[in-house]
Amino acid sequence: MNLSPLHAITNVGVLLGGQASAWQKNLAAFGTDSYIRTQLENLIDAAQLKIAPVVREVSQIVPGGLTRLRQIIAAESADDIKPEEIDAEPAVSVPGILLGEIAAVTQLGQLGFTPEKYTAYGHSQGVLGVECLTELPGDNWADDEKLVNYVAFAFLLGAAASQATFGRMMSVQGVPVELLPIAPGVINSPIRAVYSGDSAELAAVKRAVTAAVDKYNATIDTHERGGEHVDVTFADLGVKAAFHHE
């Protein structure tokens, strides 16, 4: 099989993702590289030092959050890491996702695929990674002021989102987005969208979408239109904050 080397590929886009992703597995996989693991650990230390005046308050919002991040990074294998309830807390997931993206861009750079050779796009929280990673991290991440500042901000942002406890995220799958009676926060595909809000708001979305689906399916049963029934699936995305909430 003939594979083109990365540096020979042109017009490439790299997507940095956000919440409701397998960020724990990704971060753990990067941590199995001893060089990257050490860099991540030192970067976390530097970011914690940066927020030293408020670090105690931040750590009290989600006790054990920092320990969980260190546990993921120190895992011998990504298979050793299983999702835990604390992972849904933005205080853990927001810095965890950014740290994983820093590691990913570094590994691409080690292959000769540096940031100037591709266009980076951020989905959701991924915009933070795009802004942070306009160039390849240096030899010592803890001395890179830009990296330290962004990771420190991620810790503060995540803690603030966890403290606010203003909702969750729910996906709606199987329904053409044009049939949705309430505008979603994010559209992932023609038949998948994400809503954010508190429990009452998401329950209202479920009722409205279910009613719209029932009405649509009824028109098929009465032969007012052709086609197949629409089957809707609702799923909690395991994110304890209403990202994309308006």
Pin down the residues of each PLM region.
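FabD-like malonyl-/acyl-CoA
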Residues: 2-177
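Alpha/beta catalytic cores of group-transfer enzymes, especially the acyltransferase/condensing modules
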Residues: 133-246
